[in-house]
Amino acid sequence: MKIAILGANGNVGARLVAEALRRGHHVTAVARRADSKADTAQLTHVAADIKDPSLPAKLRGHDAIISSIHFTQAQSDDLLALVRASGVKRYLVVGGAGSLEATPGKLVVDAPDFPAIYLDEARAGKTFLDVLRGVDDLDWTFLSPSALFVAGERTGHFRIGSDTLLVGSDGKSWISFEDYAIAMLDEIEQPKHLRQRFTVGY
């Protein structure tokens, strides 16, 4: 498959690139700073902002686009316009945990002890998800990580959920970037959450 990854230089984006290449896919890695000298037969780097008028043409013909960009750094309208202009129907979003339910009817982001430093990003992520839920012309998927989202090991062992924060038997809610990337690529290869949000955790 041909997969384009927006925000390919970030913590999550880099793991998504690595996982896609590991599975033999052809990857277009899009970032504001990209080195075409690092291109290979499987990997093409594109230096572009999401508003770059030349970007839609470079994404045309891909099987899927993954957006791994902070919600406070890009407007949903701009991202959706880019995907639509590219003609690619499969659109996957690296989401946040804030929009998950901690308990029925209570979102993680609304908890009194939610870290203030992440508040704007979490609220923007919830808004983005709300916008996506009204989109019916793209085959979108929004994948939320667990509360703690960090570098770790690629184990291949994790749980999948829907709209509720996953918490382990040890009381912790977390997932590594590496295992998150596995869940995202699994969804691309075998779609099970079209026009849905799902979550991943241990």
Question: What are these regions, as identified by a protein language model?
Answer:
Residues 3-5, 65, 91:
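Conserved hydrophobic beta-strands of the Rossmann-like cofactor-binding core
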Residues 3-22:
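N-terminal Rossmann NAD(P)H-binding glycine-rich loop of SDR-like oxidoreductase domains
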Residues 7, 31, 95, 144, ...:
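Short beta-strand/turn micro-motifs composed of small residues
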Residues 23-27, 137-139:
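A generic structural motif
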Residues 29-36, 147:
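Short, polar loop motifs at secondary-structure junctions
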Residues 35-86, 192:
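NAD(P)H-binding glycine-rich loop region in Rossmannoid oxidoreductase-like domains
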Residues 71-158:
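Glycine-/Pro-rich loop/turn segments that contact NAD(P) or position catalytic residues
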Residues 119, 126, 134-202:
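C-terminal substrate-binding/catalytic lobe of Rossmann-fold NAD(P)-dependent oxidoreductases
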